[in-house]
Design a protein with these regions (language model features):
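Terminal low-complexity segments of carbohydrate-biosynthetic enzymes
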Residues: 255-345
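A conserved acidic beta->alpha catalytic loop
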Residues: 53-63, 115
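Glycine-rich, basic loop-to-helix element that forms the pyrophosphate-binding segment
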Residues: 81-102
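Conserved donor NDP-sugar-binding/catalytic core segment of glycosyltransferases
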Residues: 120-153
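Short, flexible, basic/aromatic active-site loop/helix in glycosyltransferases
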Residues: 155-178
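Acidic donor-binding loop at a coil-to-helix junction in glycosyltransferase catalytic cores
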Residues: 204-210
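Short, acidic, metal-binding catalytic loop of nucleotide-sugar glycosyltransferases
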Residues: 35-46
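Short beta-strand-to-loop acidic/aromatic patch adjacent to the donor-nucleotide binding site
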Residues: 102-116
């Protein structure tokens, strides 16, 4: 591990923050990431850029050294040679590099090497973390090849998430919000990251897993569309089943895509809303009927939960018929037929 170009400026009153990026043979895109990081508005924030170079055999390290020589923030680098790293393990290593650089106190943000944070990204993420424990920012594709089906898919899931918050409102949600969590734009405090055990060593989906774990632990997850990172719509990515893989699949056989049935999702969202109210009032009779559990069982679960978020995530099951999948076209029609869905969309 090495720190290149440490700053001597006083950082005592600024919020310590680490931008954590896993890098694997990204020489083609690192210059645009570095340029974007240099443009970040950082008033009141003491950022540092933490780069985990995972089995790189291109010019990535040379580019990092060239950038760090004149960077306006500390650049901290760790190289891992010939590793068995997958997406989750590499991102976790990048986050732990950031953790060590912060001495265990501050904010960890993560993005990807092919991403370009908006100028106000740091400020927006920090503002979000004043209201929540985890902030999942919005990822906007840099469109070099149109994909109307993916546009429809994203619009559907945004409308579905709006339905969720109309049926199960929480006061920490972003306004505007969006539907997903991506490692290209995610932030939380060091203590929160440690409490969750970090990103799991998964080949893909490590970001969604961390956010699900956070909600089940009772942490407030804020999906905030004002925290924006632009990312590549390249078709050749570093992660199996990542965005690049999704784009290739849609290019090839997109009309066959299926999505969550909004009727089943709405059933679960309503249950979450009922569970929150039951937890707040310590009155579990109506919830017991809805989820087919005994009042004694619900009281016991509530006793072990730190707050309503954790309780709702634990006690509301999947719908009686399971979480079905339907075609995107059918799902769009079904969502529009749900009264709260019409308002949400």
């Amino acid at each position: 591990v090495s720190e290149i170009n440490p700053t001597s400026a006083s950082r005592a009153k600024a919020l310590p923050l680490a931008i954590c990026v896993p890098v694997r043979n990204e020489a083609a895109v690192l210059p645009q990431l570095f340029a974007a990081v240099e443009r970040l508005e950082r008033t009141g924030i003491a950022p540092r850029l933490c780069l985990l170079l995972d089995s790189c055999d291109d010019a990535s390290l040379a580019l990092v050294r060239d950038h760090a020589a004149n960077a306006s923030m500390p650049v901290i680098v760790e190289e891992v040679a010939a590793s068995d790293a997958n997406a989750g393990r590499a991102r976790h290593r990048a986050m732990m590099l950031g953790d060590r650089s912060l001495d265990g106190d501050g904010v960890l943000l993560t993005t990807d090497a092919d991403s370009i944070p908006s100028r106000d990204w740091l400020q927006a993420m920090v503002a979000g973390l004043r209201q929540a424990d985890v902030v999942a920012g919005k990822v906007v594709r840099t469109v070099t090849q149109s994909n109307p089906l993916l546009d429809r898919l994203e619009a559907y899931y945004d409308a579905l998430h709006a339905l969720r918050r109309s049926l199960d409102p929480v006061d920490w949600e972003g306004k505007p919000a969006h539907h997903y969590a991506s490692g290209a734009n995610l932030g939380l405090r060091v203590a929160s990251y440690r409490s969750l055990g970090g990103f799991q060593p998964l080949a893909n989906g490590e970001d969604g897993r961390l956010v699900d774990d956070a909600a089940r632990a009772g942490l407030r997850v804020r999906r905030d569309a004002t925290c924006v990172v632009h990312t590549s719509d390249r078709r050749l990515g570093r992660v199996a089943h990542g965005l690049a893989g999704t784009l290739r699949t849609l290019d090839r056989d997109g009309e066959a895509i299926d999505v969550a049935d909004p009727r089943d999702a709405a059933w679960q969202y309503r249950g979450h809303g009922v569970a929150r109210l039951a937890f707040a009032k310590a009155d579990f009779a109506s919830l017991a009927v809805a989820v087919e559990l005994t009042i004694d069982h619900l009281v016991g679960v509530a006793r072990d939960c730190p707050n309503a978020e954790s309780f709702a995530m634990r006690v509301v099951p999947t719908p009686p018929g399971g979480m079905r999948r339907v075609s995107l076209g059918i799902a769009e029609v079904e969502l529009a037929a749900i009264p709260a869905g019409r308002r949400a969309a």
